């Protein structure tokens, strides 16, 4: 058979195979068009479950007469014009296929009027070439689309339609979902001439809660927690039922991304993990959740019906949802008798993530590390602890910044020689036991902090400082253990039999390190949870290495074992190539001053800079 261009009606019917699955698919596409047109009132009339008639009437902006032919053509849309528009899409529709596809498998009439027109116009596509005829009509500002005899010309598709009751149940559920996505829109649903659903526009919190109750029912409202959390450009809000409000089926699970109805595996996985052990296997969570983020951070053009999306920062979104819901559920504790007991969740995260394209910092995946040991003064209520006289740094002057490039020449390392005995004794002597006088000037190569005191400069190694603080913090809190965080995708790997047995023997120790493993059968282990420190590491390589380390130190006492394992965590968790921002560097300096001021006299931690030769050059040059 030779290659040929398909006739328009056949091409549209093929496209309809993806877009028009059943009558509810038609309702979805047409109502989304109404919402994109700015309608705040949409009426939906259904006859015979949608097989006989689907009529959508709205008060949106309408379509001009000279655009009606295009409206029924394939790949014609007013919603995107360039690739940039597609990458940051805000509308519900964008492909320009729906009307052409629907008209190819039904008898469709499209009647519309804009505010600028004195009369309305009606369009209808007919025949093999799908030619559009236009005639005047009576209609207020807005649009009405009538779809009659769905699948009349595709008997095979019509044969797969279910009963009238089943098809209308799908439409009813769709309208309920739309009602929760747009509280500001009045929705009326009729079936065979009778009003089945009527949702008035809800513009206040009380009205929104009434609509929520109308859609989800009173039992859901009784157990509902209002939750809201925000991190950088990502916001999560909505309602979720406590475990006591769980249901025997998953019929009350609504999620929306930027106002778009969604059934996304990643989102569902994060929600299930948040409930984790709170629900038995035969119970399902109930929730209505809204995720709002930069449209450029989500790709909606990955599913024919737009039910799924692809997040550019998938792990960030997954862990953000998990952390927000996990925190809300644990804060709530037992079920509250008060409906809608609002829980404002503030995630303990580090510096905001910058969009687009920047990978999240490793610290984001859990509580921000505070490596200070719980000092006695702090436990007793002191607000300053041992930080002493340390003052927040002031930014360096322009004159100081100009000279820094020529000043950053460090002395060679002096093996075994105390800093006070080094060649730069005057500078070393200036390093105080209390570093309150030290002033942080700027970052150098995002790995060192330039310090100044009495016109003398020194460099602080931020990696060494953080490793020291982290090691001390881990040892101090070893008995409490590290918090385990679920992996987006569990990691499985094969182990020799002796290490499989070791995992079972050392289960308690591994959990103390924030690692949870379970058997995958026949020499296979599955890693399901890790501490935040190891989130961004090569887990398949590190876990066997860790198990061998534990095995080799099995004869050591508990204290020695803790020191070895804490050092291992530090080395794996803080890479030598780690980069820092100024705020993090300054925090590390504050904690170093408070707990390890003696380390400021260690040339491995702080190196003085040789200024004498530079100053001499300036002097010689007058």
From Swiss-Prot:
One of its GO terms (biological process) is mismatch repair. InterPro entries: DNA_mismatch_repair_CS, DNA_mismatch_repair_MutL, DNA_mismatch_S5_2-like, HATPase_C_sf, MutL/Mlh/PMS, MutL/Mlh/Pms-like, MutL_C, MutL_C_dimsub. Residues 376-401 are annotated as: Disordered. The keyword DNA damage applies. GO terms for cellular component: mismatch repair complex. Keywords: DNA damage, DNA repair. This protein is involved in the repair of mismatches in DNA. It is required for dam-dependent methyl-directed DNA mismatch repair. May act as a 'molecular matchmaker', a protein that promotes the formation of a stable complex between two or more DNA-binding proteins in an ATP-dependent manner without itself being part of a final effector complex. Belongs to the DNA mismatch repair MutL/HexB family. This is DNA mismatch repair protein MutL. It comes from the Bacteria.
């Amino acid at each position: 058979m030779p290659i040929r261009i398909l006739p328009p009606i056949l091409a549209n019917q093929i496209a309809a195979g993806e877009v028009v699955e059943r009558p509810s698919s038609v309702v979805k596409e047409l109502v989304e068009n109404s919402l994109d047109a700015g309608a705040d009132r949409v009426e939906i009339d259904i006859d015979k479950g949608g097989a006989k008639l689907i009529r959508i009437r709205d008060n949106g902006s309408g379509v001009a007469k000279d655009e009606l032919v295009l409206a029924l053509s394939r790949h014609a849309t007013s919603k995107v014009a360039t690739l940039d528009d597609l990458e940051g899409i805000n509308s519900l529709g964008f492909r320009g296929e729906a009307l052409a596809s629907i008209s190819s498998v039904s008898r469709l009439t499209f009647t519309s009027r804009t505010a600028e027109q004195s009369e309305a116009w009606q369009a209808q596509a007919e025949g093999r070439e799908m030619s559009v005829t236009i005639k005047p009509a009576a209609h207020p500002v807005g649009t009405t689309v009538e779809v009659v005899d769905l699948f009349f010309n595709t008997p095979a598709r019509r044969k797969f339609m279910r009963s009238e009751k089943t098809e209308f149940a799908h439409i009813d559920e769709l309208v309920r979902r739309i009602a929760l996505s747009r509280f500001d829109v009045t929705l009326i649903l009729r079936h065979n001439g009778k009003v089945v659903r009527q949702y008035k526009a809800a513009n206040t919190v009380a009205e929104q809660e009434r609509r929520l109750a109308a859609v989800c029912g009173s039992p859901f409202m009784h157990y509902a927690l209002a939750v809201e959390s925000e991190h950088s450009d990502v916001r999560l809000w909505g309602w979720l039922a406590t475990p006591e409000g769980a249901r025997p089926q998953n019929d009350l699970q609504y999620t929306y991304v930027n106002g778009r109805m969604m059934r996304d595996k990643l989102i569902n996985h994060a929600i299930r993990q948040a409930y984790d052990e709170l629900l038995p296997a035969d119970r399902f969570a109930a929730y209505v959740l809204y995720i709002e983020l930069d449209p450029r951070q989500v790709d909606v053009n990955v599913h024919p019906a737009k039910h799924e999306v692809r997040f550019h920062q998938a792990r960030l979104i997954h862990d953000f949802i998990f952390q927000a819901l996990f925190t809300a559920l644990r804060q709530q504790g037992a079920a509250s008798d008060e409906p809608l007991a609002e829980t404002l969740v503030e995630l303990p995260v580090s510096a905001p993530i910058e969009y687009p394209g920047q990978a999240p910092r490793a610290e984001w995946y859990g509580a921000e590390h505070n490596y200070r040991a719980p000092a006695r003064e702090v436990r007793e209520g002191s607000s300053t602890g041992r930080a002493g006289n340390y003052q927040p740094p002031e930014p360096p002057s322009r004159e100081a910044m100009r000279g820094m490039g020529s000043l950053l020449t460090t002395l060679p390392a002096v093996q075994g020689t105390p800093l006070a005995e080094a060649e730069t004794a005057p500078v070393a002597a200036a390093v105080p036991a209390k570093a309150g006088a030290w002033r942080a000037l700027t970052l150098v190569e995002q790995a060192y902090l330039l310090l100044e005191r009495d016109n003398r400069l020194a460099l602080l190694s931020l990696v060494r400082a953080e490793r020291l603080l982290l090691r001390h913090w881990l040892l101090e809190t070893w008995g409490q253990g590290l918090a385990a965080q679920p992996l987006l995708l569990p990691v499985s790997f094969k182990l020799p039999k002796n290490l499989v047995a070791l995992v079972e023997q050392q289960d308690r120790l591994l959990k103390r390190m924030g690692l949870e493993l379970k058997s995958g059968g026949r020499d296979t282990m599955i890693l399901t949870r890790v501490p935040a420190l190891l989130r961004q590491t090569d887990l398949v390589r590190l876990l066997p290495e860790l198990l061998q380390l534990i095995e080799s130190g099995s004869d050591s006492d508990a204290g020695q074992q803790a020191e070895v394992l804490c050092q291992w965590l530090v080395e794996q968790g803080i890479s030598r190539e780690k980069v820092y921002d100024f705020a993090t560097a300054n925090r590390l300096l504050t904690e170093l001053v408070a707990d390890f001021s003696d380390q400021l006299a260690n040339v491995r931690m702080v190196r003085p800079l040789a200024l004498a030769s530079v100053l001499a050059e300036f002097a010689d040059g007058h």
